[in-house]
Amino acid sequence: MGQKVHPTGIRLGIVKEHTSVWYADGRTYADYLLADLNVREYLQDKLKSASVSRIDIHRPAQTARITIHTARPGIVIGKKGEDVEKLRQDLTKQMGVPVHINIEEIRKPELDAMLVAQSVAQQLERRVMFRRAMKRAVQNAMRIGAKGIKIQVSGRLGGAEIARTEWYREGRVPLHTLRADIDYNTYEAHTTYGVIGVKVWIFKGEVIGGRHEELKPQAPAPRKKAAK
């Protein structure tokens, strides 16, 4: 069977950036890595309803800077900033260094793979038909400006006895083009029949020279006249 490389991992350093940026050696590396995993798990648990897409962690000298990318910044900040201050205090105690929290708003959640996967999973948990959930998400993404999108669901779809995989795609999703900006993420829907996995690929355009370039449709080649 053909094996597929992770769409984000293969593009790191080309069109994708690392979500953890710091330097460590020896045992410190393992400690930092475990701390990052614990921080992300803690924030995702605390901010379940805040539509959090990504958490970036930077560690300059003896401090930590955490950037939370969310479609609902008001929920993260809380009334008069009380909630985000509580998060900062908890993370400072957990990481052992002063923590600064930045919040980045996602203005187009329809073009974010994690948020699209979460939306589809939540619909599946509410017993919405999987084809309707996938088609609605694909249409919304294409309407907002995606160049292409593919959604795949796997599991006991519709309560079937045998698990299967279904997918829906519109536009182009060039996984082998390294300069293609493809946002990929997964999420799980916990239904009464078991777990259904959701995968989302969103093609936003090609990155050339450090910036997005609009893809123009190619004109069809002129037909050659047959010799008489």
From Swiss-Prot:
GO cellular component, one term: cytosolic small ribosomal subunit
Domain KH type-2: 39-107
One GO term of the biological process aspect: translation
TM stretches of this protein: none
UniProt keyword Magnesium present: no
Pfam families given in the database record: KH_2 (PF07650), Ribosomal_S3_C (PF00189)
Molecular function (Gene Ontology), one example: mRNA binding
Entry keyword set: Ribonucleoprotein, Ribosomal protein, RNA-binding, rRNA-binding
InterPro entries: KH_dom, KH_dom-like_a/b, KH_dom_type_2, KH_sf_prok-type, Ribosomal_S3_C_sf, Ribosomal_uS3_bac-typ, Ribosomal_uS3_C, Ribosomal_uS3_CS
Assembly with partners or alone: Part of the 30S ribosomal subunit. Forms a tight complex with proteins S10 and S14.
Sequence similarity: Belongs to the universal ribosomal protein uS3 family.
Annotated function: Binds the lower part of the 30S subunit head. Binds mRNA in the 70S ribosome, positioning it for translation.
Entry protein name: Small ribosomal subunit protein uS3
Organism: Stutzerimonas stutzeri (strain A1501)
Encoding gene, per UniProt annotation: rpsC
